Amino acid sequence: MDKIIKSIAQSGSFRAYVLDSTETVALAQEKHNTLSSSTVALGRTLIANQILAANQKGDSRITVKVIGDSSFGHIISVADTKGHVKGYIQNTGVDIKKTATGEVLVGPFMGNGHFVTIIDYGTGNPYTSTTPLITGEIGEDFAYYLTESEQTPSAIGLNVLLDENDKVKVAGGFMVQVLPGASEEEVARYEKRLQEMPAISHLLASKNHVDALLEAIYGDEPYKRLSEEPLSFQCDCSRERFEAALMTLPKADLQAMIDEDKGAEIVCQFCGTKYQFNESDLEAIINDKA
């Protein structure tokens, strides 16, 4: 089961979140049938949103949009504070690797664009923030958002490793944030440790990558685990929700579906589930509108 572990240094000078998001990203790949680069880009966005959602309280709903002008198009993710996340990528078929190493490429195919977050607190006044894409690698773009928009300097690591068949092998990440009151000496020490950390891809390849991440972040610094919470890819779409959407259409459009297509098929963008509405279903909706 996927999870996020929240921890804090014994000194109270900084905190860290580490995540195992393997099942989340694997299910997203299965739902959308994504190829290598698209899988990694979508996976990193889902992990970023899992971190962002874990930072919220109450019943907030968090939307992350990575909007580029190159091959991937838009990547959209929605998460809640209960550990659920869903998402999709416009172009599922990007599959580009370095010839020499086989490394999956992401940044060069994101292009210029923006990292957009929408936090809906359920009050009717969602908070929206937009920051530019810095590298298109998503992790750096997320860190820039946290620094610029939330005024919280953060170190972020996100990645998805694929097997020889380009299926998700492991996915996860971390966030480290300095807390108010940390001394300059403590900040310098943590910055040095982060600079010396192995690459996130190397840590994820460890047998127990969650423990490997924590060990790399804290070293011999005492820390305590605050909580361990489950994470999952879960879509909240339903037939009732799409039926309500059909109710908003003009009668003429619904009648055209009956006359021309003998019904309607609606596919959820986030999970690919198909919902069929036959002629009788559409006629009932038309009658309900009357």
Swiss-Prot record:
NCBIfam families: PRK00114.1
Record-given protein name: 33 kDa chaperonin
Protein role: Redox regulated molecular chaperone. Protects both thermally unfolding and oxidatively damaged proteins from irreversible aggregation. Plays an important role in the bacterial defense system toward oxidative stress.
Keyword Electron transport tagged: no
Family: Belongs to the HSP33 family.
Keywords for this protein: Chaperone, Cytoplasm, Disulfide bond, Redox-active center, Zinc
Example GO molecular function: protein folding chaperone
Subcellular location as annotated: Cytoplasm
Organism: Streptococcus pyogenes serotype M12 (strain MGAS2096)
One Gene Ontology cellular component annotation held by this UniProt entry: cytoplasm
Superkingdom of source: Bacteria
Taxon lineage: Bacteria, Bacillati, Bacillota, Bacilli, Lactobacillales
Posttranslational modification: Under oxidizing conditions two disulfide bonds are formed involving the reactive cysteines. Under reducing conditions zinc is bound to the reactive cysteines and the protein is inactive.
Any Gene Ontology biological process: protein refolding
PANTHER family on file: 33 KDA CHAPERONIN (PTHR30111:SF1)
CDD domains the record matches: Hsp33 (cd00498)
Major localisation: cytoplasm
